[in-house]
Amino acid sequence: MRVLILGSGVIGVTSAWYLAQAGCEVTVVDRQPAAALETSYANAGQLSFGYTSPWAAPGVPGKAVKWLFEQHAPLSIRPTRDLRQLAWLSQMLRNCTAERYAVNKARMVRMSDYSRDCLNALRAETGIEFEGRQLGTTQLFRTQQQLDAAAQDIEVLAQYGVPYELLSPAQIAQFEPGLAGGGAQMAGALRLPEDQTGDCRLFTQRLAELAAQAGVTFRYGQQIERLEHAGGQVSGVQIDGRMETADRYVLALGSYSADLLLSLGLHLPVYPLKGYSLTIPIVDAQRAPTSTVLDESYKIALTRFDDRIRVGGMAEVAGFDLSLNPRRRATLEMVVNDLFPGGGDLAQAEFWTGLRPATPDGTPVVGATPYANLFLNTGHGTLGWTMACGSGRYLADLMQGRTPEIDTEGLDVFRYLSPRSARAQREAA
């Protein structure tokens, strides 16, 4: 089976790896000169198998109004003229109920938990190195209100058997001794011992090398322009002005996936959620994090690589703008100075931004479509690195006609389509 994968971020490359391992003839196409040069380039670096939550949560609508007036707000909305932004925000607000939050979080935890097992198996099989650590995540709560609000998340963790531990303020430094050098006061913390860390770009590029050795063809620097369809199937992809065909197609273009689907009449509610990061050289390892620390107040993660600290987070709903906002840099610097002062050289930090492909309910879109030979692997939001291996393996099983190892409920695009709508799109094709 010939498979054409569109996109060479961590999602596209893991898809290519698992499909090649299943015996498919795989080609990956991307506009960039190498793998992982867009959203996968400098994300926060945490593999948050336990810390998996949708942005659409109870209380967020009220908080969003308050955040409009805060300098260091974790979420900001900058209106554009794109009507899709308004539609996406409307759908997100409808998912901010306790009932929807529980459903969405359970789906996300299901995929994240599976992805951890897939990544661990991949590491054991290939020996791939990506400055990874398996030392867990410490989620910091600055207020008792934040700690109390974590009860619902803890219920889901218990439901899925995800190990966790609640820490008192005095216990936090046992896992992150560098925090003792900061002046921040904490009400407590949630410890997720099975979470991991690692450089997503390094992982993706090294897995691309392994995939190439396994027979995958990577074609970089090529513009993916349009999908064509006929008879209920995709009939080809226009790449650099030339139509190319395959037996099956995988769309893994992150935030740009939705635009490409418009020519098929398929409206995918994936919208860019802009995030920022700083990559900071370590100057004092004793004052740096040992793994991943999550600051619940600012929704910022601080992650340890070998000799660097990656500080990442925030979410701007601002369309496809990739400009660097200096106020966001100030927020990242404020948090790292508050928690780990003196650990890194901020003057030498690399400031970066990327567009995470977010769905309004937080769950990715992985699986089949109304077009028989088109599959999607996108919409992972802030958790693409976390869910990449599980999504890739899950998709490969679906495309090979094998029964996936996890429940498929609610993971594909059909959750957004009524049966009548899906049938009409098939017939129109």
From Swiss-Prot:
GO terms for biological process: D-alanine catabolic process. It catalyses: a D-alpha-amino acid + A + H2O = a 2-oxocarboxylate + AH2 + NH4(+). InterPro entries: DadA, FAD-dep_OxRdtase, FAD/NAD-bd_sf. Its cofactor is FAD. The keyword Protein biosynthesis does not apply. Its EC number is 1.4.99.-. Keywords: FAD, Flavoprotein, Oxidoreductase. The keyword Flavoprotein applies. One of its GO terms (molecular function) is D-amino-acid dehydrogenase activity. One of its GO terms (cellular component) is cytoplasm. It comes from the Bacteria. Pathway: Amino-acid degradation; D-alanine degradation; NH(3) and pyruvate from D-alanine: step 1/1. FAD binds at residues 3-17. SUPFAM superfamilies: FAD-linked reductases, C-terminal domain, FAD/NAD(P)-binding domain. Belongs to the DadA oxidoreductase family. Oxidative deamination of D-amino acids. This is D-amino acid dehydrogenase. The gene is dadA.
